[in-house]
Amino acid sequence: MGNSSATGDGGLLAGRGPESLGTGTGLGGAGAAALVGGVLLIGMVLAGNSLVCVSVASERILQTPTNYFIVSLAAADLLLAVLVLPLFVYSEVQGGVWLLSPRLCDTLMAMDVMLCTASIFNLCAISVDRFVAVTVPLRYNQQGQCQLLLIAATWLLSAAVAAPVVCGLNDVPGRDPTVCCLEDRDYVVYSSICSFFLPCPLMLLLYWATFRGLRRWEAARHTKLHSRAPRRPSGPGPPVSDPTQGPLFSDCPPPSPSLRTSPTVSSRPESDLSQSPCSPGCLLPDAALAQPPAPSSRRKRGAKITGRERKAMRVLPVVVGAFLMCWTPFFVVHITRALCPACFVSPRLVSAVTWLGYVNSALNPIIYTIFNAEFRSVFRKTLRLRC
């Protein structure tokens, strides 16, 4: 990376100077609006995402693999509200002027990059998890620790993307101490590609493949259920017997005493059953045809988990769509200013797209409440207990 300064061209916190929105000497109308809006936004992010974390931790019905990633996403939003938003609002109230130390600015930039990247990487991790769950469900169900490892990987990669900022990348000659931004244009391009422009297409591709595979699985399951339905005769003639439908007796001799006295056949060895005096065309009673219940119970348990996960997946396109709607304008403006220093971008536009990106942190709990009945009922229960 080079050391070309991006001062005045904006970073993840807009990076505006005193000339942009105000003089920095008083709390004008724009500063008051920023203060009120910032306090409301911080309160909504803290309340909503805390409710998500408490609900998943306290209710077993919400403790699914998908919701573990949602908790990680909520944790990123909570950290953003605690570590980034207060200083961002402070800068906005001052009209874009940074009055604190440059070292604090660098820490703020690094936290902003890391948490924004963590949000995107968590959504990518959900797409990977859902893709594996749909394409190789049997192997997926046996790997209970994979979700935690994937979540840990998202945070480590996010920290790696943000690390250059705290390692001195922002310490460039002639730095303006009144502007808090990313100073290196090469790093702005690098972080934008790693944090947004590379993972987002991959995430969308995985979601497309996941929902396509899910539709195929449901179609195959529907066809299989119909093929197992009892067949009714379409015309005169002897009824067609279905060996899976109840007991049919055809010229069978009486059962042996061992069969009459034994309450279940599952305790008999297979050799006893193979010596049954039935003719090849006859069928034994239901008891003799009983199968061990363990595989069936496992299949039913897997079906229940799959059904719950399918319900959880319905909210994911809305979460991803809201994220892209809120953050795409910011990253487009962000990388445009880095690649085209001569291009003029209004400071007010920079401020608007930055606010829009941060608003996304407050949207996810609202989305869960509207589009997920399980979250909605648990939210109500949790709020009643806390009030």
UniProtKB/Swiss-Prot annotation:
Membrane-spanning residues: 35-57, 68-90, 107-128, 147-170, 187-208, 315-337, 347-369
Keyword line: Biological rhythms, Cell membrane, Disulfide bond, G-protein coupled receptor, Glycoprotein, Lipoprotein, Membrane, Metal-binding, Palmitate, Receptor, Sodium, Transducer, Transmembrane, Transmembrane helix, Ubl conjugation
Keyword Transmembrane belongs to the record: yes
Membrane topology note: Multi-pass membrane protein
Cysteine-cysteine disulfides: C105-C180, C340-C343
PANTHER family registered for this protein in UniProt: ADRENERGIC RECEPTOR-RELATED G-PROTEIN COUPLED RECEPTOR, D(4) DOPAMINE RECEPTOR
Designated name of the protein: D(4) dopamine receptor
Organism: Rattus norvegicus
Lineage: Eukaryota, Metazoa, Chordata, Craniata, Vertebrata
